[in-house]
């Protein structure tokens, strides 16, 4: 945010609504009238005035991503399956080994779409006007849960074809939904850290009151596909907010085991539990470019799964049968741009 040279207004970057591109705006002073300076599909950051002029300098960021599929036993044999501009940028999951659900914004809204890997165009299953993200397939592929911004983040459920959409949570805000491949329930993180019993919650896909799973305040979770174990990240407020990562059994049959050293919270939130293994697949750039690596929960050394030399990985999913890997993969390009105030 910066004052104009005449002191009659402010320049700032902001979104008109959640999920929209970040644009440059002018707010006049003192009446507070708002005027849009840019109006396109790019994102702008760090708006400022060029030296000795009224021209605006900003950083324009262009993000592109599409869905790619590879066999789990040969993850470098990867093939592109969608052509959208930002496919999977805000989440993706397998409905079946032959069908992917993912975030998309070809319509200008952040929708959820589904595509069959055997061919055919993608179909929107949750569309405007809300901003949808973090799709997770539940109940043996019959249901999709996701976060929808409806005056706050709340979790919704729809049938896999986009019918029978219903809101499942109604608190201050709810994020990071996870669910087992089989079973009609989900776990999520409540944004209300003061909620009784802890903010790691469990709810039925049929609706009703959610309940606490563990008495911790958590900031990220990851659920095994069999629904028996859950990883959670929490901050130890008695120890300089040190992050701890614990593994808990959903039925309480074993005490919480804390991992030492813990994986980073990004690995925990964005990684995926490998079917049949005590390990996560996650994105790491230690090789020089973002690639998939394994993080063992039993102390085994990490293993590199892919060997890309360029590009970004924005998200990943593993099919329930363990046969396929899906990636949201693309690029981020940034350029400095100059705008005349007459624009």
Please tell me what each predicted stretch does:
Residues 1-15, 20, 40-59, 83-103, ...:
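Conserved beta-propeller blade repeats
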Residues 6, 20, 30-33, 52, ...:
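Cysteine-rich, disulfide-stabilized extracellular repeat modules
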Residues 14-18, 26-45, 70-90, 115-133, ...:
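Multi-bladed beta-propeller domains
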Residues 19-25, 64-69, 108-113, 152-156, ...:
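Structural motif
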Residues 192:
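Extracellular glycan-interaction surfaces
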Residues 322, 330-333, 342:
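A short, acidic, flexible beta-alpha connecting loop/helix-capping segment that sits on the rim
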């Amino acid at each position: 945010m910066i004052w104009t040279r005449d002191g009659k207004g402010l320049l700032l970057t902001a979104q008109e609504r959640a999920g929209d591109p970040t644009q440059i705006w002018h707010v006049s002073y003192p009446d507070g009238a708002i005027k849009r300076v840019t109006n396109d599909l790019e994102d702008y950051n760090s708006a400022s005035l060029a030296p000795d002029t009224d021209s605006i300098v900003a950083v324009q960021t262009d993000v592109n991503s599409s869905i790619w599929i590879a066999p789990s036993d040969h993850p470098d044999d990867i093939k592109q399956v969608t052509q959208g501009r930002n496919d999977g940028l805000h989440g993706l999951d397998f409905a079946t080994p032959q069908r992917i659900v993912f975030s998309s914004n070809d319509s200008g809204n952040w929708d959820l779409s589904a595509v069959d890997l055997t061919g055919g165009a993608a179909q929107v299953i949750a569309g405007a006007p809300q901003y949808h993200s973090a799709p997770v397939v539940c109940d043996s592929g019959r249901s999709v849960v996701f976060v929808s911004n409806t005056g706050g983040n709340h979790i919704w459920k729809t049938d896999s074809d986009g019918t029978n959409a219903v809101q499942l949570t109604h608190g201050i805000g709810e994020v990071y939904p996870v669910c087992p491949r089989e079973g009609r329930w989900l776990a999520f993180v409540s944004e209300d850290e003061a909620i009784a019993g802890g903010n790691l919650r469990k709810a039925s896909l049929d609706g009703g009151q959610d309940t606490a799973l563990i008495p911790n305040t958590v900031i990220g979770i990851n659920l095994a596909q069999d629904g028996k174990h859950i990883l959670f990240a929490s901050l130890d407020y008695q120890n300089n907010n040190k992050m701890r990562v614990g593994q808990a059994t959903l039925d309480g049959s074993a005490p919480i085991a804390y991992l030492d050293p813990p994986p980073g919270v990004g690995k925990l939130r964005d990684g995926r539990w490998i079917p049949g293994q005590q390990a996560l697949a996650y994105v790491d750039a230690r090789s020089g470019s973002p690639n998939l690596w394994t993080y063992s929960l039993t102390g085994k050394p990490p293993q590199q799964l892919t060997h890309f030399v360029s590009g970004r990985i924005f998200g990943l999913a593993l099919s329930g049968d363990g046969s396929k890997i899906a990636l949201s993969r693309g690029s981020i390009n940034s350029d400095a741009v100059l705008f005349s105030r007459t624009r």
